[in-house]
């Protein structure tokens, strides 16, 4: 990664009548960087990718890719980018090679160059031995690798990956993450990833923009984001309570020191709190409801903790499922309503 800015976004906004899907976001992405947009479904991540990939026009604001404006120079922008959407675009009845020949022909790539490129890409994702097999017989992980190299046929400088590990089993997710890192390392491809998966953001991204309610509410490296809640004033604790009940949870949430509370299972609470008296306050609250504390552990912060700390709620699969886990985030009360 170097200091050359490839993507520059300034006050980008997308509205549908009175509904704001992307609300005046600004960020830049440097050449060779893997940049992540992290947040729940409905936060505005995919809409942002649609704007940057010229599939939708912004209501306000500007963005450039490789120096080209996404509205005025949309044709030039499209020559620079590759898009991997959440939906896999492949024809099951065609072989891997036939699929790539078809999609490569849409870019008007000369046949001899396309044939060589297909062989190189199949080798890159370790699918050479399956080049003559029908894609309909592939595992989900293999299909996702095919989906990615389809977007690489035109040798893009910039890749947009929308939820690249969504729906994959753990092993396939690892394979896709390793491939993304290899692509970035060997080709210096600039990559923007949207995800609600903490592990993807943590393991892949050089910098992360946390999105919530159509806004970017924090932007930094994973390490620096975690430092937001790793100071002397903040405590992250895990409690095992043998007789955990709704009354006990509400009593803990009512403590003035509490920033966020998550119930992990039938006996465990994960708590973010502030102040010197945090431990004592939580223990007193549990015991006041006759709770039986079996264990108490001090934890290191995760990106999930950062999201809770900033927004006051968890990252959920759907914006409709967001459940406030405390009275407010440490960065102030959050706007009402849901981004769809």
Language model segments and positions:
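Conserved ABC ATPase signature
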Residues: 134-138
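Catalytic Walker B motif of ABC-type/P-loop ATPase nucleotide-binding domains
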Residues: 159-162
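Conserved ABC ATPase "signature" region
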Residues: 101, 105, 112-130
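Conserved catalytic motifs of ABC-family nucleotide-binding domains
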Residues: 155
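ABC transporter nucleotide-binding domain
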Residues: 178-274
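Conserved ABC transporter NBD signature motif
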Residues: 61-72, 77
């Amino acid at each position: 990664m170097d200091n050359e800015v490839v993507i520059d976004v300034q006050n980008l906004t997308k509205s549908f009548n009175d509904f704001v899907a992307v609300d005046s976001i600004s960020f830049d992405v440097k050449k060779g960087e893997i940049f992540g947009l992290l947040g729940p479904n409905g936060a505005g991540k995919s809409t942002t990718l649609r704007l940057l990939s010229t599939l939708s026009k912004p209501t306000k604001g500007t963005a450039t890719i490789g120096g080209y404006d996404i509205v005025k120079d949309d044709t030039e922008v499209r020559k620079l980018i590759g898009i991997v959407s959440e939906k896999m675009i492949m024809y099951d009845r065609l072989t891997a090679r036939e699929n790539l020949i078809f999609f490569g022909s849409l870019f008007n790539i000369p046949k001899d160059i396309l044939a060589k490129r297909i062989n190189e890409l199949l080798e890159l994702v370790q699918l050479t031995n399956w080049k003559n097999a029908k894609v309909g017989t592939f595992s989900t992980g293999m299909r996702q690798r095919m989906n990615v190299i389809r977007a690489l046929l035109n040798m893009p400088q910039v890749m947009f990956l929308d939820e690249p590990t969504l729906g994959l089993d753990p092993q396939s997710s690892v394979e896709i993450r390793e491939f993304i890192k290899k692509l970035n390392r060997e080709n210096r491809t600039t990559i923007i990833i949207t995800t609600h998966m903490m592990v993807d953001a943590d393991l892949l991204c050089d910098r992360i923009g946390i999105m919530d309610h159509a806004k970017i509410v924090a932007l930094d490296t994973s390490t620096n984001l975690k430092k937001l809640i790793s100071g002397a004033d903040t405590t992250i604790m895990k409690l095992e309570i043998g007789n955990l009940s709704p009354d006990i949870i509400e009593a803990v949430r009512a403590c003035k020191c509490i920033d966020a509370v998550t119930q992990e299972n039938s006996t465990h609470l994960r708590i973010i709190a502030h102040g010197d008296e945090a431990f004592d306050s939580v223990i007193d609250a549990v015991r006041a409801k006759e709770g039986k504390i079996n264990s108490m552990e001090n934890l290191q912060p995760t990106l999930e903790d950062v999201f809770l700390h900033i927004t006051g709620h968890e990252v959920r699969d759907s914006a409709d499922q967001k459940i406030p886990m405390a009275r407010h985030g440490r960065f102030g009360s959050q706007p009402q309503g849901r981004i769809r």
